[in-house]
Amino acid sequence: PSDRIGQPYIQVDPKKIVGIVETNWPDEARGFADADPLTDKIGQNVADFLAADMKRGIIPSTFLPLQSGVGNIANAVLGALGRDKTIPAFEMYTGLIRDGRVKFGSACSLTVTNDCLQGIYDDMDFFRDKLVLRPSEISNNPEVVRRLGVISINTAIEADLYGNVNSTHIGGTKMMNGIGGSGDFTRNAYIS
């Protein structure tokens, strides 16, 4: 997931530039509420489940790249995985990187809070070889996801006896989570 190709800049023909607008207006993203005991417990349960699967040999002892959605539960899972001494350092390969996973990632979109973005700017030398942004045609490509052996984690609202999962709607009409690229990862992951 951390392999790199290309250049760390975009080459543009100067004749095609019509104007440059300088601004110090920061990018903004919606933050998430602080973790509560319930989200912490969910995160710990998922981390314990993955650690047990690794101990049984279902997941390799080197672990696998992780794909995760966004939100309080995803942040709680990643926090619990980070604290678990039995799980080695791992890479992220996901469609969207948020604050909770910015220190290790590969994605097609970087959406972080203002404080996190400023932290990236302030420590660019550290992050330069840690973050890789790719077009979604690559990051969500089923063949790439399958080849990497990604562990896909997404929040499910409900599941039926046949394994069908509703991860978007409550009561049929209220949308709770966006679908995004989760389907690409879920169908092609090593474990989902």
Regions from the PLM with identified roles:
Residues 1-135, 148, 156-165, 171-178, ...:
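Metallocofactor- and cofactor-centric catalytic cores in central/energy metabolism, strongly enriched
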